[in-house]
């Protein structure tokens, strides 16, 4: 991948390309060296995805490479700090209300001072940088939400969790960031079901979500147009189905091995390196590499479930499965939305799509999956109980 980019930019090689990729390689070796290459499976998968993400940035917007690499460094730092915090479940319990309040406060602040881009008011411009708060709130949502239900699925804790979830999802609806709201809702379902095992509760929440979606489609024309295009992208190839049809053409033209970095045409389509990144990777580096990216997220989920059934604390089990489930759901929305198998929602592909907020926050979320690893497995600690959903799982 890097070689194909070097060949593409042979006459006008951006300095950012060798600097950022050399820095990425050095970062990976230092991290693995400090860890003595022990138990770094999750991180190696993440490094693969991050590398593909930098390939995408280098091909689509070379000027964004420094920013994207800085986001990788920030994400790794957040991953390490969060991993240290998660070693102490009691500390996590003490921090849950503070983290939860900060998350809700950030979303409310976004409602008042946020900028509208792509139809959603989900950006805050700090002058020197623009951030997407909802990406970082995903980390806080898992941190505080899982801590709320870690000890007991009592009526009080359930009410607190539902109120917290509503306080996070509600502002996202007001911002018209429905794709991210759907990801939060999936996380809420995973957390609630893993702790209770109650299908009736899940069915009730799902029914409310369907009713809410129907209202949104009925009263928001641009959302309705996306659903009208769904499964009919070729009929609207010159209008609302343009992005989906161009993505499918790109996947077909790239074949299994791609046309080479920088040689694709999808970059001329809006959001090619973010919402349509699966097609972008497929065209330039091949469908095999794109499927490997999806496979990494599946491996995260398998790792989370395998370790969760032996976790010392229910918190580790719930948080890991929630993070992995949100990753998978987000990737499914990205892949299937851009290929007209689902309505296009405009969400990124974790760790691959171009964007600093998405990169840093998703890297931080990996800490929840890493925390359920072998050092936190064994017989359940006294008073911690088991997770109902996982009590029958043995992989």
Locations of the language-model features?
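Hydrophobic alpha-helical transmembrane segments of multi-pass inner membrane proteins, especially
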Residues: 10-240, 279-340, 364, 368, ...
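Transmembrane helix boundary and interhelical junction motifs in multipass membrane proteins
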Residues: 177-182, 257-262, 272-274, 291, ...
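Long extracytoplasmic/lumenal interhelical loops at the membrane interface
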Residues: 251-288, 308
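A juxtamembrane structural motif centered on a specific transmembrane helix
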Residues: 2-4, 334-393
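Generic N-terminal amphipathic/basic segments
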Residues: 1-2, 13
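Glycine/serine-rich anion-binding loops at beta->alpha junctions
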Residues: 128-137, 174-176, 255, 259, ...
């Amino acid at each position: 991948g890097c070689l194909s980019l070097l060949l593409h930019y042979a006459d006008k090689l951006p300095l950012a390309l060798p600097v950022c990729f050399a820095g990425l390689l050095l970062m990976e070796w230092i991290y693995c060296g400090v860890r003595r290459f022990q138990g770094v499976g999750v991180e190696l998968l993440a490094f693969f995805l991050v590398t593909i993400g930098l390939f995408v940035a280098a091909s689509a917007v070379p000027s964004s490479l420094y920013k994207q690499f800085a986001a990788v460094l920030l994400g790794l730092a957040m991953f390490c700090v969060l991993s240290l915090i998660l070693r102490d479940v009691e500390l996590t319990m003490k921090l849950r209300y503070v983290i939860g309040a900060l998350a809700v406060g950030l979303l409310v602040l976004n409602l008042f001072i946020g900028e509208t881009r792509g139809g959603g008011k989900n950006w805050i411009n700090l002058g020197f940088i623009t951030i997407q708060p909802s990406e970082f709130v995903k980390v806080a949502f898992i941190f505080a939400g899982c801590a709320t239900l870690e000890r007991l699925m009592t009526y009080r804790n359930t009410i607190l969790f539902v109120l917290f979830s509503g306080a996070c999802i509600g502002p996202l609806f007001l911002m018209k960031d429905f794709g991210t709201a759907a990801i939060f809702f999936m996380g809420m379902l995973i957390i609630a079901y893993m702790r209770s095992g109650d299908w009736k509760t899940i069915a009730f929440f799902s029914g409310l979500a369907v009713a809410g979606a129907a209202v949104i489609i009925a009263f928001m024309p641009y959302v309705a147009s996306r659903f009208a295009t769904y499964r009919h992208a070729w009929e609207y190839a010159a209008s609302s189905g343009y992005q989906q049809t161009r993505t499918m053409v790109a996947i077909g033209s790239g074949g299994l091995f791609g046309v080479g970095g920088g040689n694709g045409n999808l970059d001329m389509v809006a959001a090619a390196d973010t919402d349509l990144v699966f097609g972008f990777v497929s065209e330039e580096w091949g469908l095999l590499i794109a499927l490997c990216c999806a496979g990494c997220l599946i491996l995260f989920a398998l790792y989370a479930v395998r370790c969760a059934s032996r976790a010392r604390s229910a918190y580790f089990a719930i948080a890991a499965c929630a993070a992995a489930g949100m990753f998978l759901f987000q990737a499914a929305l990205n892949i299937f939305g851009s290929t007209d198998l689902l309505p296009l929602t405009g969400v990124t592909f974790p760790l691959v799509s171009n964007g600093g907020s998405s990169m840093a926050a998703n890297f931080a979320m990996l800490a929840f999956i890493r925390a359920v690893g072998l050092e936190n497995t064994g017989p359940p600690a006294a008073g911690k109980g088991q997770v109902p959903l996982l009590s029958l799982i043995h992989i």
